[in-house]
């Protein structure tokens, strides 16, 4: 455990941020899985919006977001 006051604060903030990021990533995965289960235009739009939002917040890398959207679009086209 950290002894310095600022290190203690950072450790607490890290735990909170980790919980928040985990929840957001889980929600993103859920939306993508919903699209894969039922690939419709509406589900694609929801998944695409969620992916873009995650990328803009820094949750996932912009290149990963682009790759994911491309793969979902290909699945929708088939």
Curated annotation (Swiss-Prot):
Record's keyword terms, sorted: Ribonucleoprotein, Ribosomal protein, RNA-binding, rRNA-binding
GO MF entry, a single one: small ribosomal subunit rRNA binding
Pfam families the UniProt entry points to: Ribosomal_S20p (PF01649)
Signal peptide limits: none
GO BP term (any one): translation
Matches recorded under InterPro entries: Ribosomal_bS20 (IPR002583), Ribosomal_bS20_sf (IPR036510)
One Gene Ontology CC term in the entry: small ribosomal subunit
Gene3D superfamilies per record: Ribosomal protein S20
Organism superkingdom: Bacteria
UniProt xrefs under NCBIfam families: S20
Family: Belongs to the bacterial ribosomal protein bS20 family.
HAMAP family for this protein: Ribosomal_bS20 (MF_00500)
Function: Binds directly to 16S ribosomal RNA.
Protein name: Small ribosomal subunit protein bS20
Organism: Streptococcus thermophilus (strain ATCC BAA-491 / LMD-9)
The organism's taxonomic lineage, starting at the top: Bacteria, Bacillati, Bacillota, Bacilli, Lactobacillales
